[in-house]
Structure formats: C-alpha cells, structure tokens
Amino acid sequence: PEQVLVVNCPGNVSPAAIVRIRDFVAAGGTLFTTDWALRNIVEPAFPGTIEYNDRSTGDEVVRIEVVEADSPYLAGVLDGENDPQWWLEGSSYPIRVLDAEQVRVLIRSRELGERYGEEAVAVVFPYGKGEVFHMISHYYLQRTELRNARHEQAAVSYASEKGVSVDSETAEMMADLNLGDVESAE
C-alpha cells in the first residue's frame, strides 16, 4: 500500500471521521487497527465483517498459531514453529468473524477461543481497493511470560539456531536476555 493509517485502540470517533476512514480504505489505503478500535472504528466503518463479541479478556498470555505465515503482515515477525505467545491485556476485545468468505484469520489461539469464545488474534479483509488489518491487544505493548524452556533460553542462542549472525558486541548485549524478554517487545 502507498498509505497506511494506524489506529491504536481509540476512544470515541466522530461519524464524519468514520466516513473518512472508510473512504481512505476504499480508495486503496490500508487501515491497521488494534483492540478497542474494533468496536469504535471497524464495526461502524465496515459493518458485517468483524465485531467485538462482548466478552472482554483478562490480563494473560495465550499460545497462538500462525495460520498464514506468508502474509506480508507477518513476514519476518512470527515464526510459527516456535510456540509463539500473545499477551491479552485486561479488557481486550475478542474478534468475532462475521464474513468468513472475506475475512482471513492470520493468527489464531485455541486458548483464546476456549476462554473467550473466539480464536482470531489477527485478521485482514479487503474493502474497495484497500484492506483492513485488525489484531487483539496492542501492537506496541507485550509482556514477558516464560511458559517453557524455549522462552528461558538465551536470546543469542536462539538467533544462532535461526541462522542469524550477530557480532560480538551484539552477542554481549544479548547475553543477559532470554528469548521471552526479546519476544515481549518491552
């Protein structure tokens, strides 16, 4: 896309702004939204696609499964082979898919589905000449939870395992970090 609009969990947005956002996407823009933007932006701008299921989450971490590893939204970000985790902030909005023909689930979580009734963690759908990407929780804020031995391993060891070479200065900086800390994006 030539232009991307990021809306990270807003409060109320005016009806005029909703129309401008919808027109932006229809003209070929990409809308990237998180969490409460589901109810406040996506539902009014793109009805019948996805919605909040009215069961807000607790503050916890769930295992996720990458469904579309080749999606440009996920390229180089998540490696589905390594038991990735996702932080659900308290009061995050689970995503209910209403139009399964148009909406593609990129990431899902069985744990999220068992606890809150919806498995979708990140979705994308086309609208006009553009598209909308939405994810539960926030893109900038994650937390560490060491759930298994992989998360406790040294970050430099993981980088080496994945074929990422690091110079000695970077390796020294990474020496005290475990993989869980790196994945948490703190």
What annotation goes with each model-predicted range?
Residues G11-W86, Y158, K162-G163:
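A glycine-rich, often tryptophan-bearing local segment used as a flexible ligand/cofactor-contacting loop or short
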Residues P1-E2, N40-A45, L98:
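Short loop/helix-cap segments at secondary-structure boundaries that form the rim of catalytic
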Residues V7-N8, G29, G90, G130:
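Glycine-centered flexibility motif
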Residues P1-N12:
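Short, well-ordered secondary-structure micro-motifs within conserved domains or adaptor modules
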Residues E2-V4, G48, R104:
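Residue-level marker of intrinsically disordered, low-complexity segments enriched
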Residues V7-N8, T34, M135:
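Generic beta-strand/beta-sheet core signal
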Residues E60-E186:
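Catalytic beta-strand/loop cores that center a nucleophilic Ser/Cys/Thr
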Residues P1, V25-A26, F125-G128:
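Extracellular/periplasmic catalytic domains that process cell-envelope and extracellular macromolecules
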